[in-house]
């Protein structure tokens, strides 16, 4: 009983933290529903998806709202991964619904990302999900619903029991739940495992390998890194699950490769990638406004996921920086094997990037031609050798953004132009130097 008491107390403490950040709380046992139905659509008192859609689209009849809900419930896919990816993209991007009778179109959005207060955020524990011929049930510890859609699953382990740890929490989600209640997990892009001990509260996805679950140790970039177990629980709630931050991460920092790639992987950003993306995007926008042509420099430790950070930045520039007018991005690498490595990732990420054509460039003339054919969009990968003074300017358009991967190898005199600010753990700071360049240094010692 003692162990059970402590586990239930931890669950309650987590819910209290979520409530403090703006999540409504409901005990799953008080929600009247068919136990196989993961969406909150049946109980008149907890009918979040229908209520949200009726509030957002008052011109739709009840029958139309039911049809929209059923469209979400029956997203196709030949495998669990395909259904997860397709469902997530529908929830994130919405779709166009044509009303019966008059043919009027409605752009349905299951989440209002631009207006956080228009959404319904609900934390639920003891949420039974039935499966099998005998209607056995699984009960995830805590589920986070946005507008009645379960988008994050928490699995907790007793902090006081030595034989219960986050590896078991991982197995619970990735083996037992995936096997028994995939009809719930098809909606859940995010998962969190925790036993409230040091470095054991970690964020991932339902397709993240155990070793790649990652602690989120800062609420804001300038904060000190959380070191103690309960502090890390508070930090992940404030840094990931605060409603507006939660929507920001869902919108732009959850990555699936293109369907045609055939790869089954789902990635959520780590917190240094999140803060670096924010800072670099702001720096690029500032440089564009001030016409300095100096977007910034980002330093990351080996293995910290710099290529994914560049992908997150590119998506931000494409979708969230309207003043750039859908820029063209050129990724410059300094050797052919990097060109191949980076090219493979970006070539299978066209849907995520939202920049149109993604292409590896073979020579200078091809790059010049591609730039001349467009006023916006496009993502091109090429080596530094494609550039030389003899060919002159390739293009004078202002909204061409160049990423230089492993740039320190080709910028021998970098120190004469920028000042690097170093901080312990994971810290990112921007400093303007006399030469006008911006340096961002991230040192990763947190894993």
Positions of predicted regions on the chain:
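Conserved helicase motor
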Residues: 336, 358-368, 383-389
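Conserved motor-coupling elements within RecA-like helicase/translocase cores
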Residues: 361-380, 393-397
